[in-house]
């Protein structure tokens, strides 16, 4: 962002990390970047915890990701695309009444479970019956109570098991 114009360089602050893109969120590291000395002086006034809560491993992993991680990033993106398509195809084959779509630039599928008649909280029902956990749709608004969020940034084995557990719990 800071490179798009002189105005962006003068007033912009970029907050970023390698966490999501390179799938290293558990390593706790982020960056706050400015190209303006006055903004840097204001950023320097932030509480010390802001500067020192990153892990040393996260800092090294982030540096490696940004410097040499293009191949890794492309591999992660390819894997996520494969997992997304696999989830979509498994749902179509095993749970055709579950509505979903192929997400873009995400690793989360939004599943409409309303046709399964799982009660007021489908996520809780599936946790109890199938021992599979999802983010409950109601957390995203009253209109989403029959939805669950499925994070597919995991192995195909785990994704297949999760969908099989839904099928077995019905």
Give the predicted meaning of each segment:
Residues 5-81:
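Conserved core segment of the aminotransferase class I/II
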Residues 36, 115-116, 155-157:
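Helix N-cap motif at beta-to-alpha junctions
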Residues 27-28, 105-107, 146-148:
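Short amphipathic alpha-helical segments
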Residues 63, 79-88, 99-113:
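Conserved glycine-rich beta-strand-loop-beta hairpin in the small C-terminal domain of fold type I
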Residues 8, 121, 125-134, 140-170:
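PLP-dependent enzyme catalytic core of the Aspartate aminotransferase-like
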